[in-house]
C-alpha cells in the first residue's frame, strides 16, 4: 500500500511572474528575499503587479541560522496590519526562511522550542506562502519543511509541518537566466540528488519514482549543455521543469543517505549544499544496487541495464562538471569520512536509505577515482 499527496498549485512557464497579482489577491503581503540588486528589480515587478509589500525581509543569508531567523520573525510579528501572505522570492535559503517566518508569526522562540524539544506546536502560526523560486534545484517550493541551522551548537534542524506547503508555486524560468555557472550546477545537482534519493528510499512509491526518473534523466542529459550555454532559454526551461519534478518526488519520500552525509560537511567545511549532497551520489548508488527490485528498476530507467556502469557514468558526469567525488578535496580525511557515514546512517534522513552500512562500507573502494 502507498499514498502520494501534494497540495501545492504549480504555475510553470516563462513570464509567469506576471500572474503574481492574482495569487496575492489584494492581501497584505510580506516579501522575503535577498538584498541584491537583481532581487530588488524583481521585487519592483512584484510590487507593480501586487501592490507594495507591507514588509520586506531582505537579510536572508545562505543556510539561515537561528540569529537571522529570530530577527526576521521579530520584524514580522511587529508589522501592523499583520501580513496575510508571504511571498518567498529566491533560492532554497529564502524558501527556508519564509517557512520559518510563516510558522513564527508569534516570534522565533516558539519555533525554537518546537525544533529543540517538539514542544509548543499550538504556538506555531501558518501564514500562507506563495513561492517564487529563482534557482532550479531547491524543491522547497513544493515541500512542507525547512532546513534551519543552529550554528552555535553545530546542529541542523528540519522544521516540518503540513501547513508549510506553499499554497502556490510560481515557477518562471526567465528568473533563472542570470544564474552564474557555479550556482546553476550546484542547484541542479541538488535536484538530481533529490530525484535519486527518492528512488533508493524506504518511502518510495510509483508516483515519486515516476517523477524522479523524469527529473534525473533530464538533468543528466541537459545540465552539461546548460553549463556551457547559460543564456539558453530552452535549456533553462528543461532544468527548471526537472527540478520541479524532483521536488514533487522527494516531497513524499524526503531525502536519504547522501543528504544525511552532506549536512555536517556544509557546517564544518562550508561546502555548498548542492555539492555536499551530490559528490557522494556514485558511492551511495553503488551501495543501493541490488537491495531492492523496485529501486533497481527505477535506476535502470535512468542508467540502463548495467547499473554498475551507470554509477561509473554518474561519477564521470560529476567530474566533467568540475565536481570532485574525492572526499579529500572537501577537507575530509578517512577518519572523519567513516564517522560521517556512521552518523548519517542513524540520522533522520539516513534511516530512509534502503541500503545497509555494510553495503556502504563495501562501496567505499569502488569507482574509478
Predicted features by range, described:
Residues 1-85:
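ATP/NTP phosphate-donor binding region
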Residues 67-74, 78-174:
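Glycine/threonine-rich beta-strand-loop-alpha-helix active-site module
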Residues 137, 244-277, 347-349:
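Glycine-rich phosphate/pyrophosphate-binding beta-alpha loops
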Residues 145-253, 355:
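Carboxylate- and glycine-rich phosphate/diphosphate-binding segment that chelates Mg2+/Mn2+
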Residues 163, 300-369:
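C-terminal charged capping/lid subdomain of soluble metabolic enzymes
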Residues 192-196, 239-247, 261, 281, ...:
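Short alpha-helical scaffolding segments that buttress acidic/His motifs in well-ordered protein cores
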Residues 264, 268-326:
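Active-site pocket-lining segment
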Amino acid at each position: 500500500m502507498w499514498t502520494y499527496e501534494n497540495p501545492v498549485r504549480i504555475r510553470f512557464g516563462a513570464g509567469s511572474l506576471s500572474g503574481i497579482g492574482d495569487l496575492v489577491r489584494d492581501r497584505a503581503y510580506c516579501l522575503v528575499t535577498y538584498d541584491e540588486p537583481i532581487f530588488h528589480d524583481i521585487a519592483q515587478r512584484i510590487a507593480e503587479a501586487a501592490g507594495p509589500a507591507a514588509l520586506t525581509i531582505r537579510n536572508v543569508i545562505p543556510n539561515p541560522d537561528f540569529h537571522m531567523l529570530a530577527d526576521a520573525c521579530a520584524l514580522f510579528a511587529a508589522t501592523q496590519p499583520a501580513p496575510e501572505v508571504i511571498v518567498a522570492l529566491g533560492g532554497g535559503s529564502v524558501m527556508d526562511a519564509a517557512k520559518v517566518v510563516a510558522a513564527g508569526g508569534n516570534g522565533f522562540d516558539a519555533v525554537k522550542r518546537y525544533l529543540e524539544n517538539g514542544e509548543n506546536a499550538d504556538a506555531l502560526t501558518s501564514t500562507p506562502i506563495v513561492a517564487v523560486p529563482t534557482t532550479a534545484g531547491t524543491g522547497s517550493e513544493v515541500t512542507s519543511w525547512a532546513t534551519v541551522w543552529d550554528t552555535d551548537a553545530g546542529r541542523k534542524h528540519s522544521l516540518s509541518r503540513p501547513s508549510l506547503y506553499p499554497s502556490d508555486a510560481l515557477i518562471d524560468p526567465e528568473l533563472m537566466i542570470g544564474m552564474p555557472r557555479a550556482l546553476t550546477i550546484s542547484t541542479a545537482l541538488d535536484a538530481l540528488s533529490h530525484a535519486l534519493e527518492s528512488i533508493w528510499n524506504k518511502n518510495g512509491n510509483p508516483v515519486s519514482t515516476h517523477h524522479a526518473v523524469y527529473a534525473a534523466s533530464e538533468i543528466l542529459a541537459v545540465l552539461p549543455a546548460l553549463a556551457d550555454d547559460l543564456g539558453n532559454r530552452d535549456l533553462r526551461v528543461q532544468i527548471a521543469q526537472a527540478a520541479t519534478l524532483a521536488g514533487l518526488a522527494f516531497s513524499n519520500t524526503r531525502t536519504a543517505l547522501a543528504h544525511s552525509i552532506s549536512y555536517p560537511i556544509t557546517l564544518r567545511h562550508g561546502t555548498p549544499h548542492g555539492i555536499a549532497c551530490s559528490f557522494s551520489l556514485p558511492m551511495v548508488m553503488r551501495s543501493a544496487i541490488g537491495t531492492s527490485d523496485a529501486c533497481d528498476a527505477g535506476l535502470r530507467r535512468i542508467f540502463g541495464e548495467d547499473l554498475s556502469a551507470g554509477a561509473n557514468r554518474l561519477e564521470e558526469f560529476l567530474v566533467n562538471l568540475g565536481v570532485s567525488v574525492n572526499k579529500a578535496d572537501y577537507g575530509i580525511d578517512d577518519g572523519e569520512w567513516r564517522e560521517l557515514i556512521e552518523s548519517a546512517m542513524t540520522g533522520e534522513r539516513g534511516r530512509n536509505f534502503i541500503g545497509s552500512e555494510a553495503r556502504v562500507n563495501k562501496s567505499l573502494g569502488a569507482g574509478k577515482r
